[in-house]
């Protein structure tokens, strides 16, 4: 983890570059424009910036007033350092904010806690005795309070940083689909929700040994199996709730995959009274040849 402080009385212009570590920054006494991952941010007052790893950043800023220089505080951290703090924070946070928007929020007005902790780092670092372990502990403590303050301002930091540090991509996608199963999901939608590009996301899924279309079908089928077993919804209602294009299509794919109709599955599932029935059926399922209903 590394803290830096910059003081400037001149214009600060940076052409687009990629940062190699996640970063929290606070900019005071400045005005101008900052661009993070294509999102343009007009700076007119003090601002806190939340920048995930590998983000593309550029800026063109000047002092807000002639007599006062602009100040920039930055705290950068590795994936391991950020994850260690998240493990402490997760018990105090919800797993993720509802999907009201797929656009990341990279900036907020600095909460008082953020100002206080950056001020503390500026005053204390470097420590006079140059103890690396004590400096690391101080920065970790400040990062904890800074991230918590940002989260309390409504920024879903777990989701914002998730693409780089959290669960495997197939699990992240499963979480998105189960939140909105009726949405007609495409790879572009999921990539946008995870703040990445379709090509990068596809590479991650390839490394995890699964395609987007297969994952989408598996998630929807898994939900359908649970509805058939534990609810009294009709087959038509279940096909709609799980996001299939039509009841006929759902029944056709279900039969090809499990060698029985949804109604037959429901009957057998309830007659068997076996808690492992769904698991065993899934292990015996057939691969599906995709058609235009399930589209990337």
Swiss-Prot record:
This protein's record includes keyword Metal-binding: no
**Could you tell me the keywords of this UniProt record?**
Activator, DNA-binding, Plasmid, Transcription, Transcription regulation
Care to name a GO molecular-function term for this sequence?
DNA-binding transcription factor activity
Q: Which InterPro entries match?
A: Homeodomain-like_sf, HTH_AraC, HTH_AraC-typ_CS, Tscrpt_reg_AraC-type_HTH
Superkingdom assignment: Bacteria
Q: Does this UniProt record's set of keywords contain DNA-binding?
A: yes
State which residue ranges cross the membrane. none
The UniProt entry, under Pfam families, shows: HTH_18
Give the protein's biological function: Positive regulator of the expression of the urease operon.
What's the name of the protein? Answer: Urease operon transcriptional activator
* Lineage, broadest ranks: Bacteria, Pseudomonadati, Pseudomonadota, Gammaproteobacteria, Enterobacterales
